Amino acid sequence: MQSLALRLRGTGSPLDISAPEGMGVTLRPYQLQGVAWLQYLRQNHLAGILADDMGLGKTAQTLAHLLIEKQQGRLDLPALVVLPTSLVFNWQAEAARMAPDLRVLTLQGPRRAEDFTRMANFDVVLTTFPLLWRDVRALAAQPFHLLILDEAQSVKNAASRSARAVRRLKARHRLCLTGTPLENHLGELWAQFDFLMPGFLGDSRSFQRLWRKPIEVNGETLRAQLLAQRVRPFILRRRKEDVATELKPVTEIIKRVQLQGQQRDLYESVRVAADTQVRRLLARTHFKGAQISILDALLKLRQVCCDPYLIKGTKMPATMERAKLELLMTMLPALVKEGRRVLVFSQFTEMLTLIEPELDALQLPWMALTGKTPPAKRGALVAQFQSRTVPIFLVSLKAGGLGLNLTAADTVIHVDPWWNPAVQQQATARAHRIGQDQPVFVYKLVVQGSIEDRMLELQARKSALVEGVLGADGEGAVKFSEADLRGLLAPMAAS
């Protein structure tokens, strides 16, 4: 730690930089500052997290950095980019458009083993997190100039196969790209720095004792400020409202709907069953050890809010109310008539399947992208939506919430809330990003007085953790507690 401090004192600040020759896009001033910061890290043998808001061009800045490395003769070994499967075509397209001089190899498909011996002949090698641990032996045999994790929160669990695999790879320099370096708890930040600069934040146990418990459990604001000071030199984070001032602001509208009749009765019966199940769990084990089972118990309650037909193994009467679907089918025809282009996000792929026949009945054109969509087809779907020929794009939160450029959309509908607000913000950023020239309207459909309403309260408190460590003087984190659970399982207020 002392040697790192001495090195930082002698490095000065990043120098102004010009865009590299052959860059296919004009870099904005803040993007040039980002490239200068990446060069500064490389020059001083440091690592870091480029954590700009979603949609501010982290890929463009990284490609410019790689192009400079090539033009100045330092890219004698390839750079390896590890990314989610859904982003492969985006990186391929962006590299071809922005930095055509970079030779790019994609490791994909059953015959990718044939490409392992060719990696050294390319400037950039792309692979995915699911393939990384399968191919780790071959990848570990090839040294790299730069190892980049795109959407680096994918290795936030230090014990995961992907996180263990990246630690086996050899590279001169390391970089994380993510719009959400911190989503749920401080352990995620530790995992990323343990990859970037092992030992910088201590081992997992000491980090838990010195930082996580004081900040997350005890709410010690001073400790949060001290941690922020320690990591700040290695995190570059800019916000849309600060640097992309030409972007119109997002207008967020919460559309609350009330459950009626049989759907309301179903909610109450599922709530009572979930409450009983959770009480039994807590009688047998401690709260922390039961959280996965508790989330599973809460799942049915969330499904009833979204649509009763999501509950498997239960025959629903034909007269069952479907409050959100009815609201959605009122909204979408009106939005399409106004000429709006709409992204509809749901965490439940099955919910999108339930929406499809309703759109057909209304003769509204639509497309869908889920985890079952083959990677090779995703680029064509995005291009078709961007061409403005189809007004409605149904997208599963997990498959399409990261990395896609969907600026043809001016309206985003979140059918169901998710525990982590950053996940929905990432999805919204598919439309609200550089290249968007229209105001963006975001609708969140929420069942009034239900578990969903209480999830919004939890989301607001979770945001305090991000603010406290990544750049504001926020208070400490709030964990998912037993008190929170009692609120989530509380009866719905009488209408």
Regions found by a protein language model. Give the residues of each.
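Short, structured active-site-proximal loop/turn typified by the sulfatase FGly-forming signature C/S-X-P-X-R
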Residues: A224
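ASCE P-loop NTPase motor core, strongest for the SF2 helicase catalytic module
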Residues: Q2-E220, A228-S495
